[in-house]
């Protein structure tokens, strides 16, 4: 009996040491095992944007585009709305968005850990370029940009090209920042609200996207009539749609085809136009590089 007991103990010890000797067989209960990745077709595709006009003006067309993508892809698509360009960049940088509608400024300022690539650009009225309008109240005595020095100026967003950065680049020539040039600045977060702020004399001036201004002329002519344009700043490429670089190649190709053909769907044309988009076209990455260099120069000046 004693011999049998010893043999049982030795066998148990052998099993124990065999298990400990093989690292792969060791179960560490301090670690959380990752759940198996769901097939791409089962996971929602996350599409993110930040509104350039008031949310009530912008959200509806993006909801329609999200539903359209879900229908064409045959899988769930989740829309995420962020308040501003910086929040949107952070979401993309964290890898929490598969597709994002970035503003021109947000794209040229992007330096996130998550690599991204261009998928499409917006075309409006036959062009992929837009201008920055500097506006004042219709009854203002201000006639040019120089006369805005020391005045109150409304910006849209710190990373909006037409709503901030274009003015930064204009003042870069004088090695000045807007904080040094204007008496006071504030942010409205939407182009239409910047127009409203100037029209109601909350700001002496503002910088806005010419395409948004022209859209407001059509949809709210009473508001547009209360402001006037005193300057135009350099043209810039429209904001792009980007995707995570590590998204499956076949998914990227499918998304390209859907976006490029979206305007061919008669039901989607008015949806796109309400978001100041005529169609999506293949991107030209070279158009953004000069702005990226200007942004870096602006950062250096701001840090001095």
Task: Identify the function of each model-found stretch.
Residues 90-147:
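Acidic, polar ligand-binding/catalytic clefts
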Residues 151-250:
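Pocket-lining segment of extracytoplasmic ligand-binding domains
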